[in-house]
Amino acid sequence: MRVLGMISGTSHDGIDVAVVRFTLDAGGAQLRGVVEHATTVPYPTALRARVAGALPPAQVGMAEVCALDADLGHAFADAAAEAAAAPDVPEPPDLVCSHGQTMYHWVAEGSALGTLQLGSPAWIAERLGVPVVADVRIRDVTAGGQGAPLVPLLDELLLAGASGRTAVLNLGGIANVTVVGDGADPVAYDVGPANALIDAAVAAAGRGAYDADGALAAAGRVHAPLLDALLTEPYYARRPPKSTGKELFDPGYVDRVRRGAGGAAAADLSLEDLVSTLTELTARVVAQDVRRLDVARLVVSGGGVRNPVLLGALTAAVPGVEVVPSDAFGVSVDHKEAVAFALLGWFTAHGLPASVPSATGASGARVLGSVTPGAGPLRLPTPLSTAPSRLRLTS
């Protein structure tokens, strides 16, 4: 079965797409996946600005919510059609799994109460003529879970059989980690900001969308009073399962912390010093959790891996831990989440639960998503009674 997975993450800079051909080995214990195509399609500048302008704490009307749902749906449909027609995809996909764009993740007093992803899947189904799995988080929320993270499904299967305890870290807008190994159930949660605050600072200064190659951080110095104030964030001390996003770490977050702390923390800083401080914040927060988790290996992915200052600071802060890119396990650091959603779509199509309760806190595993039919009658594979226990990926 060929599945096209799609997601736009908390950096809301574009759509990650992966086309994966899955084959189940005889006996059903091992699933093999060939990543035939993987790419990132940037959002048009105007659409990205509208997404950013609608994120918390902004107040937007329902007309704009409706328009964004349609326009994001068109953007996802365009990206899917482009990937389906790529020369390295020999046949059209049988299924699409689209995460869409998270606009709001409703968490109150540590409990997830709702979640909203825009990008109507009907536009994708109409464009490609195949079924589309979407709205994948809410089923876990209704079961008492956080609705996040969902990537532990991929992490658990991909690292099945690996020796020792391994932490799998994604450095997107938000940093999230999965811990697998030693025969225990996976543990996974959102750690805190990865690129979100850095990107917001760079964008606010009109210097682009992100700190390219960590150049701004490298040119600055860490401002200790501000860093100390930022490290007092209560979220970091909360025990998992937990999830967060730009509902907390929004573009105004740093200014609120500075005003609240006063004194030296509120001093005017150069952009370079601010970005250096925020980069150190991400490295410090992630590293303290990695040390606490007592792992031998850290597998990294996401846009933050392309920032040598961030990755260097993180690596230096976890001596004795082997830091390796996810490429070593057959999945690109840039497209791991798209591959994960292709896998999630395969699970849903076969009637298999894809949530990991030990990661999300749900009362049990659930089959995720809603299915929008394609051009003809909805025909899904015969449901499987047992899920595969391992995944091997190649490209």
UniProtKB/Swiss-Prot annotation:
Pfam families: AnmK. It catalyses: 1,6-anhydro-N-acetyl-beta-muramate + ATP + H2O = N-acetyl-D-muramate 6-phosphate + ADP + H(+). InterPro entries: Anhydro_N_Ac-Mur_kinase, ATPase_NBD. Its EC number is 2.7.1.170. The keyword Transit peptide does not apply. Keywords: ATP-binding, Carbohydrate metabolism, Kinase, Nucleotide-binding, Transferase. The keyword Ligase does not apply. One of its GO terms (molecular function) is phosphotransferase activity, alcohol group as acceptor. It comes from the Bacteria. ATP binds at residues 9-16. GO terms for biological process: 1,6-anhydro-N-acetyl-beta-muramic acid catabolic process; amino sugar metabolic process; peptidoglycan turnover. NCBIfam families: PRK09585.2-6. Catalyzes the specific phosphorylation of 1,6-anhydro-N-acetylmuramic acid (anhMurNAc) with the simultaneous cleavage of the 1,6-anhydro ring, generating MurNAc-6-P. Is required for the utilization of anhMurNAc either imported from the medium or derived from its own cell wall murein, and thus plays a role in cell wall recycling. Belongs to the anhydro-N-acetylmuramic acid kinase family. HAMAP family: AnhMurNAc_kinase. This is Anhydro-N-acetylmuramic acid kinase.
